[in-house]
A protein has these predicted regions:
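Beta-propeller folds
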Residues: 9, 18-416, 420, 424-428, ...
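Glycine-rich His-Gly loop
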Residues: 129, 327, 422, 493-497, ...
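Secondary-structure transition/capping motifs at alpha-helix termini
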Residues: 144-146, 186-188, 199-202, 219-222, ...
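Sec-dependent signal peptide recognition
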Residues: 2-9
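C-terminal substrate/ligand-recognition segments
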Residues: 326-328, 361-377, 464-473, 499, ...
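Cap/lid segment of the alpha/beta-hydrolase catalytic domain
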Residues: 156-170, 181-188, 202, 433-439, ...
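Active-site-proximal cap/loop segments of hydrolase catalytic domains
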Residues: 522-723
């Protein structure tokens, strides 16, 4: 049984409050930055790098030294601490406001809450959070919700007092007696794997280190577990091992090793629990699956279909066949089926064809039904197919921008679909839908502390036209009464990489912006998959600049439509979206009054040239390989760090985590130092490093709000909003 979908209530049950006083927009800044405060500077040590006859000089390359424990390791920490102190000094006038914002954000969280239970293998599973606690308690009840509660794992007992704590995995054995738990206490995504006896509450004596969190699979014998070990240099999972609970991990057996370090691997069970699956994927360009009968854990995994460049597929088991979702002769994917003993592609038979305007995002199997998740123009639609008579229908939703998604549906033998729904004005909601009668029941809508009326807010959907004629969707939300006269500040957010779709979802924190007059806009730019697979392909590799152009063109569109005006436009993005921030800041520094770049990936050439840096090799087909001359110079033409120039830059807030395993701390650190050296303006650059966190930021539902309060205080200060 897979508990990784049992999100902590702190994350999955966002609730909000709203105050009646909508703040007006201040066009004349009343906030005053402290005067005479010198920004941190650091020494320059030229480091020359040569490729394809091109010489790059990195004066701040030495900042890589922290994890290398090199001679400059201490200097790195000193510099990061100096930057943190500078943030505190520059934001000192807003210290009280930040505290008020934190209290405001925290005040919207229902401190004692519980998720909607779902049933699997005779038990009802749910999470709950307790008042004043940071982490979730994972629970279950046998057969009926009136049964006594059993605590599977209390994350507060383990995580409280630790600088960082994260749980991933929580896989329960088929006999319901054991649970595998993955835990990270450093934020490097290196999870230690432990096993707990749910009958006695005792832990098995062994611990397995450096595993892939959430990628564990029990065999049907209730004692064998398959798990993934990560390479300590690249932090990529590369080996699958078989472990027998209660034995020394030194005796574990390696069942698979990925020889191509560009691939990501995973392990899991089919929904039917009949098979254990090992997956290997390469940047949405290639995939390969191996399967093993779960009742024969010591057997040999069989290759479903050999990896072929350009062929992507995923599988699930249903009765006497496998279903295969694939891009085989199908840009937007199609659904196929094949017999259990004939799994190579020549035996695949089409069930749902490819469609030019619809991306087949996924499918969920039931005894008598199949639910297909389909993405069309940025909106996810749920299509229900009756397996008996092949009749079909769609679930209907009436808001202009929303997210509908299949929820946790562990039970195979049911006519009930659990699905989730939310929009920019509708809090997260959980429904049960009868696939035969076509009726739905609201099981829970995230409670609104203090009362919330969605009619006080307006959500819209529009299309900006990019410079090459593409229609780019934008999802918009603002407080009712906001006039489209150009006077309001606007925060534009986007991601635009890896084919990751950005959805129009609800966020309680966002109300602090809307209630003070901000318009919030989500841009569905190329590099994501909102408009189909071609939308992704048109925003990666040698097409990456389309991502940046789309974002700029969306901002220009919103100005023309008078949602805002120049001087009141703010941009925000994180990780690969942080690269977007760096690129658009270089390309159009005049367009933004402020930019927020969270854990930004900004030193593209240097990172992609070092296969020892975590995740590099697995992303050659996303960004390019600098060993290729054409790709090298294209990446160099937009890499934020390489394109910092002597010119005016907007106000910028940059955040990172010292232990970030995905975008190393030194990328934003070097970027800040170089911009400070080169910029010709008097705007401020703030750089905040969480010395204990990684890529996901602080752990704990309250600690993370401190980061949000800092970002909002920064934006409000630039608008002259001080309360």
């Amino acid at each position: 049984m897979n508990l990784k979908n049992l999100l902590p209530a702190a994350a999955s049950l966002l609730i909000i409050s709203c105050n009646d006083n909508t703040k007006g927009v201040t066009t004349e800044t009343t906030f005053k930055w402290p005067e005479g405060v010198a920004a941190p500077t650091t020494e320059k040590k030229p480091h020359e790098m040569v490729a394809h006859g091109d010489v790059r000089v990195d004066n701040y390359y030495w900042m890589n030294d922290f994890f290398k424990k090199g001679p400059d390791s201490t200097k790195v920490v000193d510099y990061l601490k100096a930057e943190n102190a500078y943030v505190d000094t520059m934001m000192s006038a807003a210290k009280g406001f930040r505290k008020n914002l934190y209290d405001e954000l925290k005040g919207r969280i229902k401190e004692k809450d519980e998720s909607v239970p779902y049933k699997d293998n005779g038990y009802w599973y749910y999470t709950r959070v307790e008042e004043g606690k940071n982490y979730a308690v994972y629970c279950r009840k046998k057969e009926t919700l009136d049964a006594p509660e059993e605590i599977i794992h209390n994350a507060n007992q383990v995580g409280e007092g630790k600088p960082y704590y994260s749980v991933a995995g929580l896989e329960v054995s088929d006999n319901n007696e054991m649970v595998a738990i993955g835990e990270d206490e450093v934020s490097r995504r290196l999870y230690k794997l432990r096993f707990k006896n749910l009958k006695t509450g005792e832990y098995s004596p062994e611990t397995i280190s450096n595993t892939e969190g959430g990628s564990y699979a029990w065999a049907a014998d209730n004692k064998t577990v398959f798990y993934i070990i990560k390479d300590l240099t690249t932090l990529l999972g590369f080996q699958v091992w078989r472990h027998e609970v209660g034995t020394d991990p030194k005796n574990d057996v390696k069942v698979y090793e990925e020889k191509d370090n560009r691939h990501y691997i995973g392990v899991g069970r089919t929904k039917s629990k009949k098979y254990v699956i090992i997956t290997s994927e390469l940047s949405e360009q290639q995939s390969e699956h191996r399967f093993l009968d779960a009742s024969d854990p010591k057997g040999e995994f069989k290759v479903f279909h050999p990896r072929t460049m350009g062929l992507v597929y995923d599988i699930d088991h249903y009765n006497d066949k496998f279903y295969v979702r694939t891009n085989l002769d199908a840009t937007n994917f199609r659904l196929m089926e094949t017999p259990l003993d004939k799994t190579s592609k020549e035996y695949w038979k089409e069930v749902i064809p490819n469609r030019k305007d619809v991306y087949l995002a996924g499918f969920t199997l039931f005894k008598d039904h199949m639910v297909v998740s389909e993405l069309k123009e940025g909106l996810m639609n749920l299509r229900v197919i009756d397996q008996k008579d092949k009749s079909e229908h769609y679930l209907q939703f009436d808001e202009p921008a929303y997210l509908s998604s299949v929820g946790v549906n562990a039970d195979f033998n049911t006519t009930t679909l659990r699905f989730n729904y939310q929009s920019m004005v509708t809090p997260g909601s959980v429904y049960d839908y009868n696939m035969d009668t076509k009726t739905k029941e609201l099981k829970k809508q995230n409670e609104v502390v203090g009362g919330y009326d969605k009619s006080d807010y307006v959500t819209e959907r529009a299309f900006a036209t990019s410079r090459d004629g593409k229609r780019v969707p934008v999802s918009i939300v603002y407080k009712k009464g906001t006039q489209k006269d150009g006077s309001h500040p606007l925060l534009l957010y986007a991601y635009g990489s890896y084919g990751s779709t950005s959805y129009a979802t609800f966020n309680s924190n966002r109300l602090s912006l809307l209630n003070r007059g901000f318009v919030y806009v989500l841009a569905h730019i190329r590099g994501g998959q909102e408009m189909g697979r071609e939308w992704y392909d048109d925003g990666k590799m040698m097409n990456k600049k389309n991502t940046f152009n789309d974002f700029i063109d969306c901002a220009e569109f919103l100005i023309r439509e008078k949602y805002t005006s120049k001087g009141h436009v703010y941009a925000m993005g994180g990780s690969a979206g942080g690269l977007l921030m760096g690129a658009v800041t270089n390309m159009r520094p005049d367009l933004w009054n402020g930019v927020v770049a969270q854990v930004p990936y900004v030193d593209v050439i240097t990172t992609m040239s070092d296969p020892g840096i975590p995740l590099t090799t697995g992303e050659y087909l996303e960004w390019g390989n600098p060993a290729n001359k054409e790709e090298y110079f294209y990446m160099k033409s937009y890499s934020p760090y390489d394109n910092v120039e002597a010119k005016a830059y907007p106000n910028i807030l940059i955040t990172t985590g010292l232990h970030d395993s995905q975008v190393q701390y030194f990328e934003p650190a070097k970027w800040v130092a170089k911009m400070r050296e080169m910029k010709t303006d008097k705007n401020i650059i703030l750089f905040k490093t969480n010395m204990e966190a990684g890529h996901g930021g602080a752990s704990g539902r309250f600690k993370a709000l401190e980061d949000v309060a800092l970002i909002y205080a920064f934006l409000f200060s630039l608008e002259g909003i001080t309360s």
